[in-house]
Amino acid sequence: MLQKNRHFKVFLNMPLEWLLLLCPFLCGGFFPWASALVGLVLIFLLLLLLRRGLLCVALSAPFLAAASVVLFHLGGIIWGTDRGMAPVGAVQFLPLPLFVLLLEQLAPERRMDLLRRLPYAASVMVLLSFLLSCIPSLGPWFLVAGRQAGFFQYPNTYALYLLFALVLVLFGAPLRFGKLPWAAAAALGILLSGSRTVFFLLLAVVLVFFFTVKSKQSRLRILIFAALLLFISVLYVLLSGNRGSVGRFLTASLTASEFVGRILYAYDALPVILRHPLGLGFTGYRCLQGSFQTGVYSVQHVHNELLQLLLDVGWIPAALFLWALWQGFRSREGGLLRKLLLAVPLLHCLLDFDTQFISVALLLFLVLDTAPQAQRKFSPNRAVRRLSAGILTVSALLCLWIGSASFLYYLRKPADALRVYPAYTAAIADLLPTASDEDLGPLADRVLRLNKAVALAHDARAKADFSAGKISAAIAHKQEAIRLCRYNLTEYLDYFDILRYARERYLQRGDTDSADSCLSLIIEIPGMLETVDAQTSRLGRIIRDKPDLTLPPPYVSWLEQHASEFVSNS
């Protein structure tokens, strides 16, 4: 029996290895439905271990960090910005603690074996992505602004994944000619992705290789290899004229709008982090972004994973994650290879949202060292095993429920997604632009009950209230929409039009007091725009998108004609 149990734990390597190989092909695991699928596989493996009485638990720093992320996402049902999307966030990151639990069943030396075939999978992705991108109907799936994005559909994280594979090739074992094709595929994929940050990280990895590898043959091979790649890249730019991918490296600058923008995102997010120790919850940053930004931008993520962690789930999970990282860097297990596999994604995560892709997050947690806690493992007793089986079963049902709704939403079927999960806030919001006049108000109310920070819902509610003659309510909702979209000039113009039309109706009814109140609010609009412009940061004036906060001439003319009326009446 003992021998069978040992064989079963060795058997874990195969499904975990295939999971790491295939997950990047599921859009990198970026969408909740992909995470739900990964979670179901991991839950099945854990239930098998529980049934055989083989599951051992170590309350390691990586496990506590991963588990806290899931628990605090669930807590967003209580304190988060969007209560409806909180369970979606929990499912999105549920694979992390499950994966760490399974890793703790393996000997430390076997964990790194899970990565041995990753360079092959990366090479296959490069080849498939290039070939499929040549098909016009499939090109948009694999290309972003002329840059190869792989199955991740995002060039920067795709490039990071390839760099991870390249590090495995260069430092995993002595570099031989047989490995050069895998290294070449990864390097070419990085160049075609046009990711400048990963390109500079690649140069740093090559320098580390030269200074740490003693074999002169290996150095010569990598030197010839790098020179050949550089020649091919320059030739490609000259012949094709395509600067959207390889050519982007020639335009790298610390003053580039993309780089300055990332600094701006962080600058705007820091005060929010200090005010919300429990985080904003899943999608909270995206919804509230317009209320605190000091420049013109619209992003789903802050492009810094530590800040994103603080924004989403608050201080405690972030502190646990930093503790796990500290232990990982202090550990001597795995040598230089593991240190590089840890450092490379972490450095890139400071400028992008890589761990939102669950496949990258799994790789990061794999190289976090859990060996020091191995001596503190314990086997749950019968009661705990039953409780654990119950929790895993509920988690599986949650994955099926949320994952199904997410997949329907991914297929652009929001109405069907809502039949599965009625609190899917994003799906309800997607129905607003095409809703009938009768449905507009109730749909907006459904969104606002779950998340009061959706500007689109406030706009819809304002439209419904205005149609029903509820002028005061319409004005209040329009003001809230402006607060959430301070740099959107269209919001101010709509607000102006509502007030102007309301004023005319009040005048027709002889209600001069209400008409004057509307006029006073209209007169305040230029001042509102000037305030936002004055609050625009220096960084906000450097990035490509500049504030457009000037009223069009017809609106200015109307103000000039009617401002004197307000002065005389007051």
Give names to the regions the model predicted:
Residues 195, 285, 305-306, 312:
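Extended, hydrophobic alpha-helical segments in both membrane/secreted and soluble proteins
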